C-alpha cells in the first residue's frame, strides 16, 4: 500500500526562502508606471503560493515593508533554509534595454554584474559595504553552493525565456549583499526591465505573473529532484 500522505510530508522537508526585493520606503527601480517593489512582491507571493504545495516556504516580506539586506539572509539561515530566491526587476537609462537574467553569489564578478549588484546593494549601504573578508566563507562550501546556484539559475532563466520569448541576457556571478550572507544555494532573478514597456507588458496581467511564478517553481522542483 502506497502512503501518499507520507510522501507529501517528506517532500516538505525542504525549506525555501522567497525574497521580494525592496519594499517600504525603498521603491527599487521605477518605470512604465510601475515600481519594482510592487511587482516583485506580487510575483514573490505567487511563487510562494505555488511552492507551498510541496515545500516549507518563508517570505522575507509579505507586505510593503522594508527589510534590511542582512536581515533577509538571516531569516533564511535561522530557518536552516535549503534555498534562497530573491525576485527583482532591472532598470536602465535606455528604455530599449530588455530581457531577463539571473545572478548567484560570486566573489569574482564581471564589470556588468558588479554594476547591477551595486544598484541592488545601495539600499542598505551599511551592510553592503562590509568587506567580503569579514564573512567566514568555507571554500569547499562556497564552491558547492556556487555550483548548485549557477545550475538553478540557468534552469530558471531557460524556463522564463522559453515561455515568454524574452531576451536571454544570461547567468552571472556577482557580489550581491542579499546573497552572500546566505548559507544555502541562493539566486537573484531579474525578471525583466521595469524601464522597458515590452518586458512590462509581458508581465502585465495577473495570469502572466502566475505563469512566471510557475516557471520559476519548475526550476526549483528540478533542483530538488
Which residue ranges define each predicted feature?
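Active-site-adjacent mobile loop/cap segments within catalytic or ligand-binding domains
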Residues: 141-225
Amino acid at each position: 500500500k502506497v502512503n501518499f500522505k507520507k510522501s507529501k510530508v517528506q517532500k516538505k522537508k525542504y525549506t525555501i526562502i522567497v525574497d521580494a526585493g525592496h519594499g517600504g520606503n525603498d521603491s527599487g527601480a521605477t518605470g512604465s508606471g510601475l515600481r519594482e517593489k510592487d511587482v516583485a512582491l506580487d510575483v514573490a507571493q505567487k511563487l510562494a503560493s505555488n511552492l507551498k504545495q510541496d515545500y516549507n516556504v518563508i517570505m522575507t516580506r509579505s507586505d510593503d515593508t522594508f527589510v534590511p539586506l542582512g536581515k533577509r539572509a538571516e531569516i533564511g539561515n535561522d530557518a536552516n533554509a535549503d534555498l534562497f530566491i530573491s525576485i527583482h526587476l532591472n532598470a536602465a537609462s535606455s528604455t530599449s534595454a530588455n530581457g531577463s537574467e539571473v545572478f548567484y553569489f560570486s566573489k569574482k564578478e564581471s564589470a556588468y554584474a558588479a554594476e547591477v549588484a551595486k544598484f541592488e546593494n545601495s539600499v542598505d549601504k551599511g551592510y553592503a559595504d562590509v568587506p567580503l573578508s569579514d564573512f567566514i566563507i568555507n571554500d569547499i562550501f562556497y564552491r558547492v553552493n556556487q555550483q548548485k546556484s549557477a545550475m538553478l539559475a540557468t534552469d530558471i532563466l531557460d524556463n522564463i525565456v522559453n515561455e515568454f520569448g524574452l531576451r536571454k541576457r544570461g547567468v552571472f556571478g556577482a557580489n550581491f549583499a542579499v546573497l552572500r550572507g546566505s548559507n544555502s544555494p541562493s539566486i537573484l532573478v531579474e525578471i525583466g526591465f521595469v524601464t522597458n514597456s515590452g518586458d512590462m507588458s509581458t508581465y502585465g496581467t495577473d495570469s502572466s505573473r502566475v505563469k512566471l511564478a510557475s516557471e520559476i517553481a519548475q526550476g526549483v522542483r528540478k533542483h530538488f529532484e
